[in-house]
Amino acid sequence: KLKEYDYIFYCDVDMRFVNYIGDEIFGDGLTATQHPMYAFKRPLWMPFDPNPESEAYIKQPGTLIESEGKPLFMPLYFAGGFQGGKTEKYLEAAKIISKMIDKDLSKNYIARWNDESHWNKYLMDNPPARVLTPSFVYPDSLIEEYYKPIWGCNYPPKIVTLTKKFTTRILSAQEQATLRGMSDLTKL
């Protein structure tokens, strides 16, 4: 039934649409959204899966791609909360990512950020045709003093990510490093 549609998009359940969304989401292939926490960050600081045994593992990120005729340096770290694209391309991605996740599960492993990690791995090998700004996964807990220096501008919210209880506490640098799989900050 899904194959009858020109485009398919996925959106997390904890999102609120707050602004008009037009044809800027449509491209010739996949559409991915820059993760607001990692927009304009260096690859070292992006939470790619560090386990070489995982299907989501990304060893040496860094590739120049073209999206909508504009050069982009990959990696960008993409949010899993809003994604999609041309039906054929997106269903193919979903099928492959499902197999990647199943393979990891057969080894009793869950990628660092679950399906989002696999989405990022897939996009490293199959770059998106359309890259959306963090406006499409805009945190409701936005702290302008934090995001403005990262983004260099203010993206107007289109889809707002609702804060989950476990994300309301800001983690210390050591806690963040531990979550990224680095128990010792001196290794940075």
In which residue ranges do the predicted regions lie?
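Low-complexity, flexible helical/coil segments
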Residues: Y10, D14, W45-N51, P71-P75, ...
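Short beta-strand-to-loop element that shapes/binds the nucleotide-sugar donor at the catalytic cleft/hinge
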Residues: G27-T63
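Short, surface-exposed linear patches
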Residues: E4, L30-A39, S54-E55, K99, ...
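GT-A fold catalytic core of metal-dependent nucleotide-sugar glycosyltransferases
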Residues: K1-R42
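Catalytic core and acceptor-binding pocket of nucleotide-sugar-dependent glycosyltransferases
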Residues: P61-R169
